[in-house]
A protein has these predicted regions:
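N-terminal basic, Ser/Thr-rich segments that initiate or prime the first beta/alpha elements at protein or domain
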Residues: 1-108, 112-167
Length: 167
């Protein structure tokens, strides 16, 4: 267990919350697509190159086993550690299974906002909020796995805040 509750207080009072539960399926399918060529390559290499060696069969067992473990375990762990929070002046994104990242984006730094949906997002009812900031390092901040309506709502909140800051 990671010790985090369903809602956790973030920076400046932001209530950190999980993204859509269906995002786990998006992650699972993306990992499956990533690992499938590696499994095929391992099977081919094992039969072609290792056929006459004592290591024959090792790649045919090890790589698919690792792929199954990654596809089964990683999506849940990534999901549990992906949170976002919103206050009246900032967006906070907390993520990281192996490497923890806590990103805080003040609305006044936002320059461009997008809501994107790929085929898997459409299939599972998720969207990604993309915030382009004025910074040079980490100038693009993403919040994947949001419900499409929630992503549009956050985009509109940030856009309205940007508009009022310049008036």
């Amino acid at each position: 267990m990671d010790g985090l509750s369903d809602r956790e207080s973030g920076w400046d009072g932001a209530q950190l919350q999980h993204v859509q539960p269906s995002y786990r399926q998006v992650l699972r399918l993306r990992l499956l697509v990533l690992w499938l060529p590696l499994v095929i390559a391992a099977l081919v290499a094992d039969n072609a190159a290792l056929g006459d060696t004592p290591f024959y069969g090792l790649a045919s067992i090890a790589v698919p086993l690792i792929a199954i473990l990654v596809v089964a375990i990683a999506p849940q762990r990534i999901y549990r550690r992906l949170r976002y929070g919103l206050t009246e002046r900032l967006l906070q994104v907390v993520r990281g299974w192996l490497f923890h990242t806590d990103t805080i984006v003040p609305f006044v730094r936002a320059q461009h906002l997008d809501v994107t949906r790929g085929p898997l997002d459409k299939m599972f009812g998720t969207a990604t909020l993309v915030v382009h900031t004025a910074g040079t390092r980490n100038s693009i901040v993403t919040v994947p796995g949001l419900a499409p309506d929630r992503a549009a709502e956050i985009r509109d909140i940030i856009r309205e805040h940007i508009r009022t800051d310049f008036e």
